[in-house]
Amino acid sequence: MKKIILIAYALTCTASLYAGHSKELKLTSPEGVHEVMFRQEKISSSVNEIVYQVKYRGREVIGNSRAGLQLDNRTWELALARKINQVKCWMDNLEVDSVIYQPAVNKSWHPLYGERSTVREAYNEAIMYLSKKDGSNYRLNIEVRAYDEGIAFRYFFPEHP
């Protein structure tokens, strides 16, 4: 019996060690209405991209779609004399460093005016940490929230070292 408990404990510890090192972010709303997934996908031998997908009640409503930003850093990088290989989309070749799942949120707040005196705010949240491995040290976080009413995500650029 002690052996079984010890093995179960070891497996739990091992799983928790690798939980933050997944290359995929998969999040479901509190009631399971919406599901969103972000992952890294290799599209050629030299290019990978971040794609996302959204499901509503188990049905796919947004198929694999490319997450992207149109940024033109060439002038800045030339001024800094950086030798960086330019890619078609700024988000190409971002590598997933880790995915961190935040504790579920379930709280209420009171608006100053409106139809309701109390508004419930319930969601699950995760953050995907990405970085460029081309010598630029650029980083990007994708912060994702899954509400029962819908999905929200934003791009966050941490301060550049």
Where in the sequence are the language-model features?
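Sec-dependent N-terminal signal peptides
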Residues: I4-C13
